[in-house]
């Protein structure tokens, strides 16, 4: 399954690339679906890259659902990369094993960039039984991530969706709903 999302951002390609690629380990600062993220060394280092990979805790539990993300390709000059995302500790019903993300930024004018996210999902066999639902849900999810990156780059602060997710997680940690 493949999902392609494009979004225009009112910022230079250098600024967008800096947040996405150079600050790769800190995705939890702007992505609402990631309560915590941290760098993880892998065997692949690329010239110009400040991170080899990251771990994203997806439910706020260090022993819970995670995504490990490793660069497969990285081009500092052209501002493109490919990231292998593997999901860990997921319930059996989860239809996706992981994703391959191709990320690209193009300069489209003064202080404007266009970001293209191409997600190719690695599906479990039962996902094909509900393929339209999985594709629809993943499309919404990727759309939200692109919106959150745009907001963070342009506004210099997390998207309201991230703030709401963080507040909800804090309430849950304190035993409130």
Question: What role is predicted for each listed range?
Answer:
Residues 5-7, 67-73, 98-107:
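Hydrophobic/aromatic beta-strand elements that line small-molecule binding cavities or substrate pockets
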Residues 12, 63, 76-78, 108-112:
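Short strand-connecting beta-turns/loops that link adjacent beta-strands
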Residues 11, 66, 125:
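Residues that form or flank phosphate/diphosphate-binding pockets in enzymes
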Residues 85-144, 151, 161:
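Beta-strand/loop substructures that line and gate deep hydrophobic ligand-binding cavities in soluble
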Residues 35-40, 48, 102-103, 134-137:
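Juxtamembrane/interface motifs at transmembrane-helix termini
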Residues 1-46, 176-177:
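Hydrophobic ligand-binding cavity/cleft-lining segments
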Residues 28, 38-94, 151-155, 160, ...:
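Glycine-rich portal/gate segments that line the openings of hydrophobic small-molecule binding cavities
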Residues 12-15, 19, 137, 141, ...:
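Short amphipathic alpha-helical segments
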């Amino acid at each position: 399954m493949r999902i392609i999302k494009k979004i225009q951002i009112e910022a230079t390609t250098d600024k967008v690339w800096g947040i996405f690629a150079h600050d790769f380990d800190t995705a939890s600062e702007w992505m609402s679906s990631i309560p915590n993220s941290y760098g993880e060394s892998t065997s692949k280092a690329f010239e110009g890259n400040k991170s080899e990979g990251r771990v994203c805790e997806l439910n706020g539990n260090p022993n819970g659902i995670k995504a490990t993300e490793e660069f497969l390709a990285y081009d500092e000059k052209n501002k493109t990369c490919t990231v292998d995302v593997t999901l860990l500790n997921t319930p059996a019903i989860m239809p996706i094993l992981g994703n391959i993300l191709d990320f690209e930024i193009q300069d489209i004018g003064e202080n404007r960039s266009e970001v293209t996210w191409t997600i190719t999902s690695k599906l479990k066999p039962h996902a094909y039984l509900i393929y339209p639902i999985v594709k629809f849900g993943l499309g919404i999810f990727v759309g939200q991530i692109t919106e959150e990156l745009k907001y963070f780059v342009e506004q210099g602060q997390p998207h309201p969706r991230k703030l709401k997710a963080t507040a909800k997680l804090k309430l849950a940690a304190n035993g409130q709903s």
